[in-house]
Every structure is written in C-alpha cells, then in structure tokens.
Amino acid sequence: MLYYLSLGSNLGEREKTLQQALTAIGQQAGNILRCSDFFYSQPWGFDSPNEFCNLCCAVDSHLLPLDMLACTQSIERQLGRTEKSENGHYADRPIDIDLIRVFDGNGEELSIVNSQLSIPHPLWQQRDFVRIPLEQIFQS
C-alpha cells in the first residue's frame, strides 16, 4: 500500500520531533519514499501562539489502513502525544500524524469511512499545510 501521511508539531523542538517521527515511521511502518520540505503554518481550528512545523511523506507499507493508524498513533505516544484533543477541541501538540490518502497495490485510491478512520482525509484539500506539501511530493 502507498500511504500519504501528514505530520505536524507545534510544541518543543518541532523539526527534531518530525525527524524522530520519520525515523520511527521508517522503522515501524514501512519504507519512506519521499518527503516534502518543512512547511510552517499557524494553528488551524484553534488559537495558539505556537506556529506549526509540518511536512508530508509517502510511505510504502504492507500494513492495512487500520494497522497503519494504530502504528502512527503508537509513534505519536512514543513522542509525547497524549490526547487527540482537549474537551473535543484541537490543542497544541508535540506531534500529530494523519493518514491523508491511501492507494492499493494496483494504484487505486482507497475510500474508507468508519468510526476510526476516514480516508481520504475529509479536510486535506482545505488545509494548506497538507495540500502544499502533498503537491510538492507529487511533483517530485
């Protein structure tokens, strides 16, 4: 499977945390094929003085989508992530890893919507911090 992931951090040493996340993804999830440059953005969906550092990557993996989700959530916890939100609202975080798009071995894009996962990510085209880094990967 080919996964397109979005990673972001707005707490601590953001770039270092993203590099650690990429290392963990490469060790635990699959082969990283391409990565975008860092993309800096203001928080989306909440107010914070902490700017985000984001990137996207393409990962070739044998993991099924729910297994990839579990793997990326485990990596988030390893890097200090606790809750996905505070009282149902977005909040500052040391790391966030989202599954954005997934393609099977035949190059067909998967569509999954259930209580755990929505692929393609329903908001990816509305978020410059995802859309622009993804475009960079697609152009390379």
Predicted regions: what they are:
Residues N31-I32, R101:
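A SAM-dependent methyltransferase catalytic signature shared across enzymes that methylate proteins
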Residues L7, C35, L55-C57, I97-L99:
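A structural signal for short, well-ordered beta-strand segments
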Residues M1-A29, S36-Q42:
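N-terminal beta1-alpha1 ligand-phosphate binding loop
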Residues S36-D60:
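Short, charge-patterned binding micro-sites
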Residues W44-E51, L63-L69, Q73-S140:
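Flexible, gly/pro- and Lys/Arg-enriched active-site loops
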Residues R34-D37, R131:
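Structural signal for conserved beta-strand scaffold positions within catalytic alpha/beta enzyme cores
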Residues L7-S9, S61, E135:
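Short, structured patches in soluble enzyme cores that scaffold and shape functional sites
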